[in-house]
Each structure stands twice: as C-alpha cells, then as structure tokens.
A protein has these predicted regions:
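Bacterial Sec-dependent signal peptides at the C-terminal "C-region" and cleavage site
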Residues: 15-23
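Chymotrypsin/trypsin-fold serine protease catalytic domain
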Residues: 117-206, 235, 240-242, 249-256
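Positively charged n-region of N-terminal signal peptides that target proteins for export
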Residues: 1-4
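Conserved catalytic-core segment of clan PA serine endopeptidases
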Residues: 24-33, 76-144, 169, 188-190
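C-terminal subregion of chymotrypsin/trypsin-like serine protease catalytic domains
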Residues: 22-24, 30-36, 40, 52-74, ...
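Bacterial N-terminal signal peptides
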Residues: 8-16
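Short loop/turn motifs at secondary-structure junctions and domain boundaries
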Residues: 45-49, 201-202, 207-211
Length: 259
C-alpha cells in the first residue's frame, strides 16, 4: 500500500487544517532536529480543496528528495520545511517541478508485495530555500555492509497514530514533523536488491511509518545520511512491514545527481 495521502485542507491564503492522514507512528515532535526534512503537497485539479501529501528531504537549496509515486509530474508541487502548522501558502511553501525516476513503475516491483520499482523522485524548486541544513547522499552499497538491527531514524509528516474504539480506527493527524528511531531488518531476498525493510509495528520505544510518510528519509541513525526513501507498507493499519527504496544504488544516485 502506498504511503502518500490525499487530504482535505482548509485553504484560503494559508494551509492550516487537515484531516485523515498518517505519518511516523510512536514518534515525537521533531522540532529542529531534522530541519532539512519537509512536506510536499500537490493540489488535485478535479478535487477542489484536496491535496496529495508526502514527505521528503532537502539535498541542496533547490533539490528535494522524495518518492516517485507521490505526485503527478504534469502539475506543480509545493514544498515547505516548517515543522508544523499554521502554514501560509504564499510564504512557507516554494513551488517546484516533480521529476520521478524514468523507470518508476507501479506493479513492477520485485518479490511478493511487488508494489513498485525505482520509487525515487527529485523536486526541483523554482527558488532556492535553505532550511538550515541538508541531507546527505550515501556511498554506493552502504546498506549492504550495515549489520542487522542498525539504528535508523525515520522522519515525516502526517498521522501520528490511531484512536481505536467502535468501528474503524480513526487517524490522528497534526500535520507536524515527527521522528522516531527504528531498526534495519537485513534480509537476503529479491526485494533487498532495491528496498530496505523496517518494522512498521511500534514497540519497545521504536517507531513505524504509515500513509503520508512517502518519500521521507530513512536516515542512518544519528546522521543526516539518507539510506532510503519511504515507499510502501504491507497493511492498512501500518502494523506490518515498511519497505523503503534504497538510495545507495548506483543508478539511483546517478539519477539524483543528474537533476
């Protein structure tokens, strides 16, 4: 299941209120820990008042790394590095162009989930924005040499959890940047060639990812190095496994550096 979100917003000159979205679960407000992690939105032409929401990270003052499945490249996107609401569209967001990997394909992914492949994109901002720091790209093959249960920091915007009771669980959404520690699940299968795997089931002080977190960085613990970008989860309750597209692959790095 994709981890981008379609949300309804109250928008006039500002973006302030949203409902029914999800992000880093079992986390805590990020504050200024990861100022280079931002939120990207795209207005949906045939759905007035609705936007698609994803997360991502600044690689430079005009390049924003995210997931290829997040947006339509035929329409403009907007990026903000503000950690939480209220958001003023005219001043907090910068317009940009969405550039998905040319080989991105839905339903073409390896392994049983088979969700997608080459799920990486770069937003080229129309004007430079310095959020106060930048994410760093990894060296080629870095993930392959990391041991099992390497610490990974996950960061993103969206729903922070669920309210459970009668009926369907209700999502808790604050439109705020959250972070949580997680652990790398190393495996040797067809998916590990392109994706890393993290638990999406919050426990023992660890966090997970969910809808709305797409494109957000999976950072090598305690660093600004992006190992992968969040791609999809295996169930609707975000309590299964999270798959993130590796950024340390030669062809992915060549694509990113070519934008």
């Amino acid at each position: 299941m994709r981890t981008k979100l379609i949300v309804v917003l109250v928008i006039s000159a500002f973006v302030a209120t949203a409902t029914r979205v999800m992000t880093v679960t079992n986390g805590q407000p990020d504050g200024n820990r990861h100022p280079y992690v931002g939120v990207a939105i795209q207005f949906i032409p045939d759905m007035p008042g609705f936007v698609t929401v994803c997360s991502g990270s600044a690689l430079s003052d005009d390049r924003f790394l995210t997931a290829a499945h997040c947006f339509d490249p035929d329409h403009e996107v907007f990026v903000s590095y503000k950690s939480g609401p209220p958001f003023i569209l005219a001043t907090d967001f910068t317009q940009g162009v969405f550039n998905p990997h040319p080989d991105w394909c839905l339903g073409c992914g390896p392994g049983l989930p088979g969700f997608d492949t080459h799920d990486v994109a770069v937003i080229s901002l129309n004007a430079p924005r310095n959020p106060g720091g930048f994410a760093a790209l990894p060296s080629v093959g870095l993930v392959d040499v990391l041991p099992m249960r390497t610490e990974v920091d996950i960061v993103g915007y969206g729903v922070q959890g669920f309210v459970r009771g009668d009926g369907q669980p209700q999502q808790i959404f604050l439109f705020t940047r959250y972070f949580a520690p997680s652990l790398l699940i190393q495996s040797n299968n067809v998916q590990s060639v392109e994706f890393i795997k993290l638990t999406a089931n919050p426990s023992k002080g660890k966090g997970g990812t969910c809808f709305g977190d797409s494109g957000g960085p999976d950072l090598l613990g305690g660093t600004n190095i992006v190992l992968a970008v969040n791609s999809y989860v295996t169930n609707g309750n975000c309590a299964g496994v999270t798959y993130s597209n590796r950024v340390d692959l030669q062809e992915v790095l060549e694509f990113i550096n070519g934008i």
